[in-house]
Amino acid sequence: MAGDGQDVRTYDVELTTLLGKRSGSLGVRLSGECFSGVLRLMKQENPVQGQLSPDGQCRLTGSIRTRMGAYPFEGEGHLLPECLEMILRCGGFPLPLRGNRREE
């Protein structure tokens, strides 16, 4: 979005869980050092928010909704223009989240 200082990105992601890998997407809207977005997994839309440093290190929070309930998480890792790699800590379990930016 030219002129408003925001950058919109969509990543195709894979979350590694205790029950296997789950594919989805992460859409983010960056504004300065903050971002918000939606993590789409298991047919659910999960709002997320976080902070991003100039070198790509990030922290994010949100929750993952399933048929069984909602599971809050905190994550950290790297959110780069071309890819992302993070660890989400959910219920004491580390869940790797990796992905590549979708061509738009």
Q: Where do the model's predicted regions map?
A:
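Central antiparallel beta-sheet cores of small beta-barrel/beta-sandwich binding domains
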Residues: 2-104
